[in-house]
Curated annotation (Swiss-Prot):
Protein name: Autophagy-related protein 33
Residues found modified as Phosphoserine: 127, 129
InterPro entries, sorted: ATG33
Disulfide bond annotation, renumbered to this chain: none
Record carries keyword Metal-binding: no
Major subcellular site: mitochondrion
Organism this protein belongs to: Saccharomyces cerevisiae (strain ATCC 204508 / S288c) (Baker's yeast)
Record's subcellular location: Mitochondrion membrane
Its membrane topology: Multi-pass membrane protein
Protein task: Involved in the selective degradation of mitochondria via autophagy during starvation and at post-log phase.
Length: 197
């Protein structure tokens, strides 16, 4: 094996390792962080991760392609083709999921705009937010005649605090699994050629 081919394979395997690591980091961040934080303060960080992962995926695919087609026919191993397809396949999974979710969200937003009762309900909740904090009035309003405290309802903003994973997490985990499997098979393939011995 020529030195140039060994270098391109090393760069390809390293790039796909970094790519799968970035996808794993993004999966971990999105599965453990509340949705409001993801759409708010973490958006620039996730955008940077997405751009870096895209660049590394393209870089890895390019070097796997150069390694496969630049090698003599006896050294064209299938792991080079599989490594070349990892980034496009995981990007396809994420792209299809993103397209499906954006259509679903636009449909839900159109349906929710047809029902203005939610805005009236929110306005009535805001008008109830002014409370007289006098001692006698406050105690008599919260305690019914049977002596038990009145049940309190949770307002809409507190209900909106969503701590579960967003919908894209399953698709991101699938793309991460594809990248990790591609990285592992590439490392085994390079090791099988005797490059690490």
């Amino acid at each position: 094996m020529s030195v140039c081919l060994a270098i391109t394979k090393g760069i390809a395997v390293s790039s796909i390792g970094l790519y799968s690591g970035l996808l794993a980091s993004a999966s971990l961040i999105t599965s453990t962080t509340p949705l409001e934080v993801l759409t708010g303060s973490l958006t620039p960080t996730l955008t940077t991760l997405k751009n870096a992962a895209t660049a590394l995926g393209a870089f890895a695919s390019t070097f796997f392609c150069v390694s496969f087609f630049g090698a003599p026919p006896s050294l064209r191993h299938p792991y080079l083709l599989y490594g070349m397809l990892v980034a496009p396949l995981s990007s396809f999974v994420l792209g299809c999921a993103s397209n499906y979710q954006s259509r679903k969200y636009s449909k839900v937003s159109k349906e929710s705009s047809l029902f203005p009762e939610d805005s009236k309900l929110a306005a009535s909740e805001l008008s109830d937010s002014i409370i007289d904090l006098g001692e006698d009035n406050h105690a008599s309003e919260n305690t019914p005649r049977d002596g038990k405290p009145a049940a309190t309802t949770v307002s809409k903003p507190a209900e909106a605090l969503h701590t579960g994973p967003p919908i894209h997490t399953k698709n991101l985990i699938a793309a991460t699994a594809i990248a990790i499997v591609g990285f592992v098979q590439a490392v085994i393939g390079v090791y099988g050629e005797g490059q690490f011995i």
